[in-house]
C-alpha cells in the first residue's frame, strides 16, 4: 500500500506556520532515521503548549511510515489527535499549517470500542486510539492484525510507555519503530521514559516565545484551617502547626482539608478573583478555571460552590461518560466559566482558554 507519508514531501523546515519546536523535533527524528542507528525507541520532550499534537502528525513523515498507530492516554486526548488528522475538520494540521496540499492527505481511522472495521484499518495510513481501548484480551481487532501491520507506534504522554500494557503493544508489533512524546520524561513512580531523548525544547524558550503561559502561584495564608472529621462529618478547627503535623502523617487528614466547606470557599473565591483579574487584564472573557477534585462527590461539591456564586460550572467524570461529551462541547463553545474534573482532563489535554 502506498502512503502519503512516503510519497509526499511535506513543507516543514522553514515553514513560518510550523513552530520552532515542531520543526526541531521533526528534523531530529528525520536525522535519527537517516543515521540508521539500531535504536528502535526514542523520545521527544516538548513543554505543554509547544504544539505536541501537531508534531505527532509530522512524525510519520520523518519515518516515511507505511501505517502508524497513535496511542493517547485517554479519550479526550485521542479525540483531539484525531481532529488534527481529520481532513474534513477545520483543525486538520496539514491544511492549517500549510504542510501539504489535498486531496492526498493521509487516511485516518479512530478506533473506539473493542471492535474495529478491518477494512477501515486496512485502508488507513494512521490509526488513533487510547490505551484503554487496547488493554486486556477483549480487543478483537488488535488480535487479528499481523505483526507487521504497523511500522510506527507513537505514544502521547510517552512517560507511561514503560507500563505493562504499553510493553505488550510493542511486543505485538516487534518491528515497529516507537516514538514517545511527553512534557516530562519522568513518571510519577520515578521510572524514566523509554528510549534516548533525541529532541527536547527548553521550558524557558517556550515561555519566551509565548508558547507557554507565565505561571504564578497564589499563596493563601490562613491562621487556622477547618477539616471534616469522619465519622460524623463534623468540621473541626485546628492551628497551622497542627495542620503541618497531621498533613505529614495522615493522608485522610489531607483529603479532609480540601473537602471542608471553609477551605473550599476560600479556594473558590480566590480562583474567581484571579479569573476576573485575568479577564479584565487581557480583555479575554473566554478564559476559564479548571479545577481538580478528589472523587465524584467532591466534583459535585465544587461545582455547586461555583454555581452558588453565579458562575457557569460543570464537571467530567468516568461515572458520567454519556454526559461528558455534552459538557466538553459546552466547554468548547465557551458556555462554561469553570470545568471540574477527576483525572479526566489529565496530561496532554489542551484548551487555550483554561487559565
Provide a role label for each language-model segment.
Residues 15-38:
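N-terminal pre-P-loop "Q-motif" helix
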Residues 36-59:
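Walker A/P-loop
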Residues 58, 62-96, 294-297:
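Conserved Walker A/P-loop ATP-binding site and its immediately adjacent core
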Residues 91-137:
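Inter-Walker segment of RecA-like/P-loop motor cores
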Residues 131-134, 143-180, 184-185:
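SF2 helicase catalytic motif II
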Residues 141, 300, 312-343:
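Conserved helicase ATPase core of P-loop NTP-dependent helicases/translocases
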Residues 191-286:
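Interdomain helical connector at the RecA1-RecA2 junction of SF1/SF2 helicase-like NTPases
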Residues 338-341, 345-355:
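A short beta-strand element within the Helicase C-terminal
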